[in-house]
Amino acid sequence: MIKGVLCAILVILCLSPLLAQEKIDLFGYYEAQYMGAKVKSNTYQLFTNKLRLDLKGQIADNITLAANINVLTYHGKTNWDVLEFLSDDIVSSIPEELRSLYVIPFENDIVLDNAYVRFRFKPFDLTVGKQQVSLGTGYVWNPTDVFNIKDPLDPTYEQPGHNALRGDVPLGSFHTATVLYSPEDNWRYSTKLLQFKGRMAHFDYYLIGVVRDWVFTDFTRFDAESMSFEATRERRQMLGASTAGELLGLGVWAEYAYNWMELSDDFYELVAGADYTFDFQTFVMVEYYRNTLGKSDYREYDLNDWMRYYAAEQKAISRDQLYAFAQHPVTDLLNLGLINITSFSDGSFAFVPTLFYSLSDNVEIYGYLNINFGKEGKAYSKSQGNGALIRVRVYF
């Protein structure tokens, strides 16, 4: 941890001549976050400190340099036992001597989240390094995004950077072609992406093809020699499309992707959504999500389904879900909202009241309560407990 802080200071010192010449801007934020959970008869708390430091500037006429470092510390309950959130029949199937392995740790860390250089040439732009790769038009779920998985309770939170070589080629005024290569240990499992963006009438759209490796962990099989769960690595090929625009006064979007798997069953994902703002400023949004990797009968949910979901190896555990959100500006500074997430597959749902308060131009407060409704074993079951989150962010 100390070594990481010293490295961050060294980077800033090395860039200080550019900072002095105002070629590089230094900015960021500090974030304090409290997360609490009531699970069965237990109450847990986790407090997080996060400092994000950003550097960005144009160091030449056609060259932009950008990077950010995140420093994180965790306090309180820093090891969460996943088995406390699962149904008794799943927990009872796990040997007693292995139950201590199903823990998600929160460890202090310093992360080089993004670090890239962008070259702007006349025929194309070239971006090299760890960069944002955000795909899709969906608000909560993105079938065509093979890089990121959003938290349904906090879908707008920033995503990590990904190491890649990316080229963007303008094809006239309304079209762009993008090629991306993200190297792994060999060519076969490295990510190759080709995307074509365009605009037609009131709609933006894109077509995309991706080849990428996918690791599925088998959380029922533990390898004592490597001290880890066994995992299967396979090749994933995806073709997809996405569109967003305006129709009859509504903002609408749709996204689809079909995945051909090397070893597992093929599957597809589909998103369709719409939003609208009334004259009295209330904003409403709905988004439907179908993922055939998920299951339509909650009695078929198994340990791997739950663990892969918690470990962000897959986007959903149930096949069909609906996200609904309404928000109203109570004052110029305060917005109150309500989220409802429903699993059509098993009938469970969650209510999530939200609050966003702008204390000043550079200070904001966000919070929510998470209340689950559903019988044990379902996607949003009461046995998973209820939770709360409060986040204060100060920009500089």
Regions found by a protein language model. Name each.
Residues 56-176, 198, 374:
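Outer membrane beta-barrel
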